[in-house]
């Protein structure tokens, strides 16, 4: 399935915000490519950098979710956007929302711009090198 088919298969009231978030991710983080893949039992749009998931965009029964691995590892980023998006529901590495009122696209754009420079693969490689050096 391609991205447009995935979005068009969602409830009509969700299609606009899903499209806006999808485009915002691709426009503001040039390191990622989008694919449809299963995660946590559901197909979603997975945005991969260096063949590793960086973001995910899902639409499930009662809400939509923007998964952001950069905020999972950054408490300051998590706290910043939790304050900027008070109507959304924050988890460790994702933001659940029901509509654009809970997830204004201008704030999403700032969020992706803050996440874009974070190289998760390099962070992991550096961690593993440091761990190996301690042995």
Which residues does each predicted region cover?
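Charge-dense, helix-prone N-terminal extensions
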Residues: 1-135
